[in-house]
Amino acid sequence: MSIAENKKAFFNYHIEERFEAGIVLAGWEIKSIRSGQIQLTDGYVVIKDGELFLIGLRINALRSASTHVNPEPDRTKKLLMHKAEIRRLIGKVEQKGHTLVPLNLHYKGGRVKVDVALAKGKAEHDKRHTIKDRDWQREQGRLMRHKVSAPHKD
């Protein structure tokens, strides 16, 4: 079950490869995620000292959050992956134009996981082409719907 989607990532990037990673969260963050207080659209992944960190994931604290902890909505979260996967990602990210973007957050076995994609940025003309294709698909659906619902003349 998906918690949050990053629809902007599919528009701004060509997704080349997907990976699943665990995420280190505090208790109040889990409670906020379960209530839907999460925003993923501006998130991105950086590599520091051989570890992955998710930046820009916004988790708004609930009013009933702990009183002894000062909730920080834009806190940097550490991602958990196997060292071999991280090394492979480091090699690919160092290539020109590649980056890591979060695609979605979901539950797996009661834990929150994040899908991270190895992606390459789209040029402006690619984005326009994506919009044109999406509009054409929508128009095709409309045409087919009207064609099917039109009465036949014998």
UniProtKB/Swiss-Prot annotation:
GO biological process: trans-translation
Compositionally biased tracts (Basic and acidic residues): 123-142
Record keyword Nucleotidyltransferase present: no
Region (Disordered): 123-154
Localization of this protein: Cytoplasm
Composition bias type Basic residues, residue spans: 143-154
Keywords: Cytoplasm, RNA-binding
InterPro entries, sorted: SmpB, SsrA-bd_prot, SsrA-bd_prot_CS
Ribonucleoprotein found in the keyword field: no
Gene3D superfamilies: 2.40.280.10
Molecular function per GO: RNA binding
A cellular component term, taken from the record's GO annotations: cytosol
Task of the protein: Required for rescue of stalled ribosomes mediated by trans-translation. Binds to transfer-messenger RNA (tmRNA), required for stable association of tmRNA with ribosomes. tmRNA and SmpB together mimic tRNA shape, replacing the anticodon stem-loop with SmpB. tmRNA is encoded by the ssrA gene; the 2 termini fold to resemble tRNA(Ala) and it encodes a 'tag peptide', a short internal open reading frame. During trans-translation Ala-aminoacylated tmRNA acts like a tRNA, entering the A-site of stalled ribosomes, displacing the stalled mRNA.
Family: Belongs to the SmpB family.
Name this polypeptide is given: SsrA-binding protein
Organism expressing this protein natively: Leptothrix cholodnii (strain ATCC 51168 / LMG 8142 / SP-6)
Gene name linked to the record: smpB
